[in-house]
Structures are given as C-alpha cells and as structure tokens.
Amino acid sequence: KKKGVAQQRVKISIPLPEEQWTLFFDDVDLGPEDVVGEVDEGFSILFDSLNPERIILAALCCGIGRFALNKGVAYASERNVFGQPIGAHQGVQHPMAKAHTAVEMASLMTRRAAWEFDNKLPAGASSNMAKYAAAEAGIEAVDAALQAHGGSGFTEDTGLYEMYPLVRLLRTAPVNRELCLSFIGEKVMGLPRSY
C-alpha cells in the first residue's frame, strides 16, 4: 500500500456478498513501476477490462428475469379465479410474454458478447448492448411476475420481491444505462461524443 492511499467501506442497503469501498489518493507519488498498460491509454484499457463484468452482469440479469418469470408463470397457471387460471387473461399473460421476449433477446446479445470476448474480438459494443438490454429485461420480468402474483408477490414465500432491489441496482451500477447508451451512440452509431 502506497503512502497517501486510504480506503473506506461504503455500506449499501442491498445484501450482497461483495463489499464496496471508496479509495482516497492524497499526494501519492507513483513511479514507472506503478504504470499499468500504456501512459495516456488508461481510459481505453479500463473500458476493455470492464467488458467481462458487463457480460457477467447481463447473464445475471437474464437469470433473475427467468427465475421471476418461472415463478410468475407457475402462479398464473395454478391460481384460479372465476373458474379459470389467471394466466388465461391477457392482462396477466401479455406482460409476462413481453418480459420473456425481452429476456431472451438480451440473452442472445449476452451470448454474442461472450463469444466475441472469448474469441478475442472487440466486445465493447455487444457488452454494452447486452448489459443495457438485460438490466431492462430483468426489471421488466420481476415487475411482471410481481404483478401476476398481486399482493402475494411481496411475501417472503415467493422470493420475488427480494430480486427487485438487486436487478434495479444492476440497471445503475457498476455502469448505468446512460453510459451504455452513450457508448452505443458514439462507438457503434458514430454519433458525437456525449460525455
């Protein structure tokens, strides 16, 4: 640990296995031996190193979405009102079908990003699209499953509501949707830099 480097734990309200920390650098002297990569290329190196994280988190969001939808479909198939399953009603069925479609599309982009990364191809575009799409799809899926369950979706027995804070966090961190969209706009679509 270098002189002038300090760390402080950040307490977050979502139970996660990993911890969050803030690092402070006050008058830290660095020598050539401390340089990682090439001088003045740090931002580019950082973005490339974040692609695997985006792919992993996209896969996690797809998994959360599938978990939630499996619960929602099971409940909507079993719960009968006025002699028929509530899943027979479009108001219950369509939001889950829409969320399922979004999760599967996000999963395909996640697989593409993973394939590109594994084959040492540029994966920035697909990683950002996967992260964006999967986080949005995960939230949509959890919300649709909660709505299908009604009030019982918020009970501990369903295990649904516990998914919402995590999938909502993943929409914002470690990279928020706006940065993903800015990357896509600039690097994929050729639009002027927005940040």
Region roles according to the model:
Residues 137-145:
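Hydrophobic alpha-helical segments of membrane proteins
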Residues 73-87, 100-133, 146-154:
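C-terminal helix-coil-helix/basic helical segment that borders enzyme active sites and/or dimer interfaces
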Residues 149-195:
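Glycine-rich phosphate/cofactor-binding loops in nucleotide/flavin-utilizing enzymes
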Residues 46, 72, 113, 130, ...:
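Short alpha-helical scaffolding segments that buttress acidic/His motifs in well-ordered protein cores
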Residues 1-74, 84, 179-180, 186-187, ...:
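FAD-binding core of flavoproteins
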